[in-house]
UniProtKB/Swiss-Prot annotation:
PANTHER family: TRANSLATION INITIATION FACTOR IF-3, TRANSLATION INITIATION FACTOR IF-3, MITOCHONDRIAL. One of its GO terms (cellular component) is cytosol. The keyword Transmembrane helix does not apply. InterPro entries: T_IF-3_C_sf (IPR036788), T_IF-3_N_sf (IPR036787), Translation_initiation_fac3_CS (IPR019813), Translation_initiation_fac_3 (IPR001288), Translation_initiation_fac_3_C (IPR019815), Translation_initiation_fac_3_N (IPR019814). The gene is infC. The lineage of its organism: Bacteria, Bacillati, Cyanobacteriota, Cyanophyceae, Synechococcales. One of its GO terms (molecular function) is ribosome binding. Keywords: Cytoplasm, Initiation factor, Protein biosynthesis. It is found in: Cytoplasm. Residues 200-215 have a biased composition (Low complexity). Residues 184-197 have a biased composition (Basic and acidic residues). GO terms for biological process: ribosome disassembly. Residues 159-215 are annotated as: Disordered. This is Translation initiation factor IF-3.
């Protein structure tokens, strides 16, 4: 029986940066922390200068002849590089259109689930297509569907801007939201705003309380 292949479960070896004593070239072209060219000097001389400045000697161009090093604060340099990489990744995010579907008779719990989904999509930088689906004769209730979508836009106003108001699309009613680009300016207190909101959300079925008996 052939032996079973073994998998190396060890963590991959991280490539260490070429700084200070890890630089093995005898001659280096060195640039000081302020951008001044120190010319071609020996590795030991370059390390002495870096130590005097209480900074690091960092290899920035290994393919040059001789290799180029710069004297700098490597910790700060690494932080700035990681920050730039994160910003570039954020800018390269491809905006997608995510869809949130519901019925016009959606109950309160499911409605909050849809709100949570929309918030996650918006925070990721995506647009949200809010869709109310009609079945059969439910198409007669477009006014309730529009009211539901406007309520949703209101509840998401801190995270979203309406890019396309509610409109009919076949047997559905849709609305498009995009991530809010400017902070929301509220004209009314939060409690007053909430008190004015109304939503045609179906209540879960339950027993109707019996009227109190007259004395």
């Amino acid at each position: 029986m052939a032996p079973r292949p073994r998998f190396d479960r060890r963590a991959p070896v991280r490539e260490l940066p070429n700084i200070n004593d890890r630089i093995n070239y005898p001659k280096l072209r060195v640039v000081d922390a302020d951008g001044t060219q120190l010319g071609v000097i020996s590795r030991d001389e370059a390390l002495d200068v870096a130590r005097e400045r209480e900074l690091d000697l960092v290899l920035v161009s290994e393919k040059a002849d001789p290799p180029v090093c710069r004297i700098m604060d490597y910790g700060k340099f690494k932080f700035e590089q990681e920050k730039k990489a994160k910003e570039a990744k954020k800018k390269s995010h491809q905006t997608e259109v995510k869809e949130v579907k519901m019925r016009y008779k959606i109950d309160a719990h499911d409605y909050q689930v849809r709100i949570g989904q929309a918030v996650r999509f918006l925070k990721a930088g995506d647009k949200v297509k809010c869709t109310v689906i009609f079945r059969g004769r439910e198409i007669q209730h477009t006014a309730l569907a529009e009211k539901l979508l406007m309520r949703m836009a209101k509840d998401l106003e801190e995270s979203a801007e309406v890019q396309q108001p509610p409109k009919r699309e076949g047997r559905n009613m849709i609305m498009f939201l995009g991530p809010r680009k400017t902070p929301l300016q509220k004209d009314k207190p939060e409690q007053a705003t909430k008190a004015e909101r109304t939503l045609p959300i179906a209540k879960p079925p339950g027993k109707t309380a019996a009227p109190a008996a007259a004395n």
